[in-house]
Amino acid sequence: MPAFSLNAYVALSAVLFALGGIGVLVRRSPLAILMCIELMLNAANLLFVAFGRAHGGYEGQIMAFLVITVAAAEVAIGLALTVLLFRRRAEVDVDRVNELKL
């Protein structure tokens, strides 16, 4: 099975990152924003692993593992804040939340 070239991985990663960035800017639901941030982080993971494979080292996989760990913490904190926001205000629209004090 032939492997894809590094350019294909870079292009796919750029497209995924751009889609995630557009989703963060356009969406108003905190859950959708979290999913788009996860898409952006996975695009970075793909790029790390692709460059690591192209250069024959394990550094890309180590960085991808680190990003996955940070993403798990980000999701846990983001979901906790979303649940807290919903309990306090009975809505989760990020446009209506303009102050940090709940």
From Swiss-Prot:
EC number: 7.1.1.-
Listed Pfam families: Oxidored_q2
Enzyme class: translocase
Superkingdom of the source species: Bacteria
One of the GO BP terms on file: ATP synthesis coupled electron transport
UniProt key word Transmembrane helix: yes
Keyword Ribonucleoprotein: no
Gene Ontology molecular function, alphabetical: NADH:ubiquinone reductase (non-electrogenic) activity; quinone binding
Keywords tagged on the record: Cell membrane, Membrane, NAD, Quinone, Translocase, Transmembrane, Transmembrane helix, Transport
Transmembrane segments: 6-26, 31-51, 65-85
Catalytic activity, reaction form: a quinone + NADH + 5 H(+)(in) = a quinol + NAD(+) + 4 H(+)(out)
Annotated membrane topology: Multi-pass membrane protein
Record-level GO cellular component terms: NADH dehydrogenase complex; plasma membrane
Task of the protein: NDH-1 shuttles electrons from NADH, via FMN and iron-sulfur (Fe-S) centers, to quinones in the respiratory chain. The immediate electron acceptor for the enzyme in this species is believed to be a menaquinone. Couples the redox reaction to proton translocation (for every two electrons transferred, four hydrogen ions are translocated across the cytoplasmic membrane), and thus conserves the redox energy in a proton gradient.
Stated name of the protein: NADH-quinone oxidoreductase subunit K 1
Organism whose genome encodes this protein: Symbiobacterium thermophilum (strain DSM 24528 / JCM 14929 / IAM 14863 / T)
